[in-house]
Design a protein with these regions (language model features):
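Dynamic "connector" segments at or just before major functional cores
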Residues: 1-100
Length: 103
């Protein structure tokens, strides 16, 4: 399974006209930025801008990196328990692949 497989079932509650940035691009950006030390929406945006070529190895980012307010709005619109469940599922897959009881 890939990272995206764990998150693709999350409901995107944005209206059709407000979907300039792909939900999975924003989730991927947010998770990898936080794992790299980002501590807020501006840090996530800055990480995305500085690592866009690397990010595009995994996701399209057709519209580039969204501004920090857009990242915040998109992530905040997700159902927290569903997001947590997706994240735990992804981490558990990694844990199982490396044969560890704990990560």
């Amino acid at each position: 399974m890939s990272f995206i497989t764990h998150f693709e079932s999350l409901e995107d509650k944005r209206s059709h006209i407000n979907k300039k940035h792909d939900l999975l691009d924003v989730i991927f950006l947010t998770v990898v930025a936080i794992l790299s030390g980002a501590e807020g929406w501006k840090d996530i945006k800055q990480f995305g801008d500085s690592k866009l070529d690397w990010l595009r190895k995994f996701r399209a980012f057709k519209e580039g990196v969204p501004v920090d307010d857009t990242i915040a709005r998109i992530i905040s619109s997700l159902e927290p328990n569903a997001l947590l469940t997706s994240f735990i599922s992804w981490v558990n897959e990694i844990r199982e692949e490396i044969g560890r009881a704990h990560v």
